[in-house]
A protein has these predicted regions:
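N-terminal small-domain helix-loop-helix segment of the aminotransferase-like
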Residues: 1-35, 39, 89
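Short strand-turn motif at the edge of the Rossmann-like AdoMet-binding core
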Residues: 56, 137-139, 166
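Hydrophobic residues in well-ordered beta-strands that form the structural core
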Residues: 53, 74, 102, 133-135, ...
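A short helix->loop->beta-strand "cap" motif at the edges of active sites that frequently abuts
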Residues: 49, 70, 128-131, 158
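Conserved core segment of the aminotransferase class I/II
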Residues: 156-190
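Conserved PLP-anchoring active-site segment centered on the Schiff-base-forming lysine
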Residues: 43-65
Length: 190
């Protein structure tokens, strides 16, 4: 028998326990985070939309969006301020056509974990235009500054898609097991 295309039920149930307020129906198992990024770019951006990303960053989702013909806007992080977000530049970058604000947290390549005020600024920017926050969280759990893993964006705003995998924090890149966490209609669209 072939497995379920959205992931085996018991696996989706286990992943759901990592995200408060989710069920297996909020989880889509993917071939690594790479497939999750590809699915999100294809399903969540509409003609005329743009995507906002922070730099430096892991470029896969923005590359997917660009390859599909979408405008990718960049907000440079402030290196002299420990890679903090430029919240003023973020406010200028978003508009009513911003479909996605992409966040890699902890950041790749800087390792920067967003402060609560930076997280709040991302949420406020997304809420101001109805954008989805797509949070690449594959490095959550690799932190060395604290015993607490970086908090997920999931549950902080109603339009969040969290992406994770077994590659980084779990040290199993060859397994090619990733997932996305999202509202059920998004899971169905992906």
């Amino acid at each position: 028998d072939y497995p379920q295309v959205n992931g085996i039920q018991s696996l989706r149930e286990k992943i759901a326990t990592m995200y408060e307020g989710t069920t297996a129906e909020n989880i889509l198992v993917t071939i690594g985070a790479s497939e999750a990024n590809t699915l999100v770019a294809a399903a969540m951006l509409n003609p005329g939309d743009n995507m906002v990303r922070f730099r430096p960053t892991y470029e896969q989702l923005s590359g997917n969006a660009s390859n599909l013909g979408f405008e990718v806007r960049s907000v440079d992080m402030i290196e002299s301020n420990d890679w903090a977000l430029d919240t003023d530049a973020l406010k200028q970058a978003v508009d009513d056509r911003s479909g996605i604000i992409h966040v890699v947290n902890p950041n790749n390549p800087t390792g920067r974990i967003l402060s609560q005020s930076d997280r709040d600024a991302v949420i406020a920017a997304a809420a101001s235009c109805g954008a989805w926050i797509v949070a690449d969280e594959v490095y959550a759990g690799t932190e060395r500054d604290s015993d607490e893993p970086t908090a997920s964006f999931w549950g902080d705003y109603d339009r969040v898609i969290a992406i994770n995998s077994m590659s980084k924090a779990y040290g199993l890149p060859g397994l090619r097991l990733g997932w996305l966490v999202a509202p059920v209609p998004v899971i169905e669209d992906c």
